[in-house]
Amino acid sequence: MATEKTLDDLFLDTLKDIYFAEKQILKALPKMARAAQSEEGKQGFLHHRDETQGQIERLEEVFELLGKNARGKTCEAIQGIIAEAEEIMDEFKGTAALDAGLISSAQAVEHYEIARYGTLIAWARQIGLDKAVPLLQANLDEEAATDKKLTKLAETAANPKAKKAA
């Protein structure tokens, strides 16, 4: 018979998931920056790469609070989102719609991360892991801010540029 799993186990499992996801995102962001056509898009992806490194470090602190080694668990969701981004980079390379596609991929990543961090914060509170909350909240706040920046970039530059080319 399987051993009973608890919210603590689910928290650790989800922490491993987002840790893996952040590491994959860290690898994908330079490719997205190189593919972006606008300078603002390139700089945005590079800035988020630097933020992502800080987010990984905060996640490592949460692992330390748990007395566990920082270790990821394959996150198929993020692998799928990154694969879609790579598809967009291939299919729309050199077109006016590329940046709009890259932004939409980046926002899919952000929304996944926002969902994960929100859940982890709620669970950390529930299991009494109060010292993890500010670390996770800092990551959530950065993800939400990035999502807002991406929306602004899409609405003011990338989407109109993609539409004009039609």
Predicted regions and their residues:
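Amphipathic alpha-helical hairpins
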Residues: 1-166
